[in-house]
A protein has these predicted regions:
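Short acidic-glycine loop/turn motifs at beta-strand connectors
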Residues: 114-118, 190-196, 225-226, 248-252, ...
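Structural recognition of the beta-strand scaffold that forms the well-ordered cores
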Residues: 113, 147-151, 190, 198, ...
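Zymogen propeptides
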Residues: 2-180
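Conserved hydrophobic/aromatic beta-strand scaffold that supports enzyme active sites
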Residues: 109-113, 188, 221, 245, ...
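Short, solvent-exposed aromatic-acidic interface loops
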Residues: 126-131, 203-207, 259-263
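Extracytoplasmic
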Residues: 107-109, 143-145, 184-186, 217, ...
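Active-site-adjacent helix-turn-beta-strand microarchitecture at beta-sheet edges
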Residues: 88, 155-235
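Conserved, well-ordered active-site substructure
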Residues: 160-182, 231-284, 289, 294-326
């Protein structure tokens, strides 16, 4: 009877295959680790890690393979990047707005350009006098049949409930003083009868006398007549936080900005970051609005930014909304 022997892989070949698999596994794991660290979903973290590398290092050479030369240059120099979203048809006759994604060294966010100044209004808590819980941003947009919106002024929170029922300071809506006294002096962000953005200290009576049609209280004012009026250290909260701001170009275009924060993809921004972004978009006037947990933007019925709360915007006493029609 023939001797039947089971043929198998030689011990040396088996060891070689095992070593090859191990090496490929290590290389694959290393690749995905490096990609997630330097070009991963946590954008702000990845950019921060990349900027910390020595350009001559082996690790930098690997990390640089995940970007184009222009992208590397922008990240290393902290340049603000602007990417169009749903770019409009150049032949559109009635384009109302344009949304762009912006990124910086520690943040990412969104800039909404509103080309018709008459479309921007202030929405006010209808139960302001009672102090009852205010609507959220999505409620303001939906209830007013608006097409976009951002949070606006500050709110009183004496009880620590955060219900946004009472606005802080002066609020003007449709040319009427809704909140604040006629002799009360506050930092007001307002829109006058000509659709111009006014960012200045004023009393409630002055707001009416100057023709403010829509306005809220917050600050500080960051840019006036193309000049940066905010100086680092003067009232600035020196931490990275979610930010909301409003600005305007000389042609009347309103600039509505939200910058995310308190997350791995966006640590947050300082006032100087707002100034830099606004200047990049040609603002001649700009002011900071309420930020932190309040920072939110809705566009076409959806939140476009990552709010601090997983449930979306907090309850707000006021919001800037973009109407469908004048």
């Amino acid at each position: 009877m023939a001797d039947k022997r089971q043929r198998g892989m030689a011990p040396g070949a088996l060891i070689g295959c095992c070593l090859l698999i191990a090496v490929l596994s290590v290389l694959g794991t290393g690749y995905f680790y490096m990609k997630e660290k330097y070009a991963g979903s946590a954008v702000a973290y990845s950019h921060e890690q990349l900027r910390a590398l020595d350009e001559g290092s082996f690790e930098y050479k690997i990390a640089s393979r995940f970007y184009t030369e222009e992208e590397l240059k922008n990240i290393r120099s902290n340049t603000v990047e602007m990417d169009p979203v749903d770019a409009p048809d150049e032949n559109a006759e009635h384009e109302k707005m344009r949304l762009e994604h912006v990124t910086g060294s520690t943040y990412e966010g969104w800039m909404l350009m509103v080309y018709d100044s008459d479309l921007l209004k202030v929405a006010v808590n209808p139960a302001m006098d009672s102090g009852a819980q205010a609507p959220s941003l999505v409620d303001y947009v939906r209830n007013n049949h608006a097409i976009a919106g951002i949070n606006a002024g500050g709110f009183e929170d004496a009880g620590g409930t955060g219900n946004g029922g009472l606005a802080y300071g002066i609020v003007v809506h449709e040319g009427k003083l809704i909140s604040g006294g006629r002799n009360e002096y506050q930092s007001v962000i307002g829109i006058d009868k000509e659709g111009k953005l006014i960012c200045s200290g004023m009393t409630g009576q002055q707001a009416l006398d100057w023709g403010i049609q829509e306005g809220v209280t917050f600050g500080p004012t960051l840019i006036t007549n193309f000049h940066q009026v905010f100086k680092e250290g003067q009232g600035d909260v020196p931490y990275l936080n979610p930010r909301t701001a409003i600005g305007q170009r000389p042609d009347g275009t309103f600039l509505l900005l939200v910058l995310d924060g308190r997350g791995p993809s966006s640590f947050g921004a300082k006032y100087q970051d707002i100034v830099d972004v606004m200047f990049n978009y040609g603002a001649y006037m700009a002011s900071n609005l309420d930020g932190g947990n309040s920072t939110a933007m809705i566009y076409n019925g959806e939140y476009v930014n990552n709010t601090v709360s997983m449930y979306g915007s907090r309850h707000l006493p006021t919001a800037f909304i973009v109407m469908e029609d004048k």
